[in-house]
Amino acid sequence: MEKGLSSDLIIAFVAIVLHVVNYNVTAQFEYKTRYFTKLIGRNAIYYYAVFLIISALIRDHFINVAVLSDKDSIILFPTEIANMIGDSCFIFGILLNIWTLKALGIKGMYNGDSFGHIMDSPVTGGPYQFFSDPQYVGTTIAALGVAIRNQSIYGFLCTILVGVVFYISATFVETPHLKNIYSNRSYSKINFKNLKSLKN
């Protein structure tokens, strides 16, 4: 039980939750205030994308710290098999995320809807033929790969939390927010040729 209260695991859990809270809160804040667009201009979404990538890397760092502190705590496979399965899952997850980025573009992948970049229609091609939220599936599978490769109980616990937090976020926060955005297109879509109008 004491092992389950490891500070490394707790920090990883906090990082997982805070990353999702971070992008939900900042996206809704921008949508309601246009603060970042007023401050930075039409390229605000690209700075925001970098911000979210850094946030995700910080989360991943703390997950890796927890996993490495717990390496080989649950031996499910011989090392060679664990490496092969883990690496395969990790690569698949990363490739799925790259495929999602290709399908959505930077604006679609990183909450561009909240920044006034409204899509004409939902994306149904690419990975969306198979998953409703492929970027979350990809990240979860990549985390699973890390857990398997290191045969770490902490890794599996982090993977479960990643999946659960993504599911809760997508179902109860992001979907209602997107419905609100697209039901009010006149407000949601920004005329980037006339950003001065946002200050009125």
Curated annotation (Swiss-Prot):
GO BP, one annotated term: phosphatidylcholine biosynthetic process
The EC class name is transferase
The membrane topology of this protein is: Multi-pass membrane protein
Looking up Gene3D superfamilies in the UniProt record yields: 1.20.120.1630
- The chain's Cytoplasmic topological domains, given as residue ranges, are 59-86, 172-200
Q: Which InterPro entries match?
A: PEMT/MFAP (IPR024960), Phopholipid_MeTrfase (IPR007318)
Sites binding S-adenosyl-L-methionine sit at 91-93, 174-175
UniProtKB keywords: Endoplasmic reticulum, Lipid biosynthesis, Lipid metabolism, Membrane, Methyltransferase, Mitochondrion, Phospholipid biosynthesis, Phospholipid metabolism, S-adenosyl-L-methionine, Transferase, Transmembrane, Transmembrane helix
Q: Which residues lie within the membrane without crossing it?
A: 9-29
Pathway assigned in UniProt: Phospholipid metabolism; phosphatidylcholine biosynthesis
Ranges annotated as spanning the membrane: 40-58, 87-107, 151-171
What name does the UniProt record give this protein?
Phosphatidylethanolamine N-methyltransferase B
The gene designation is pemtB
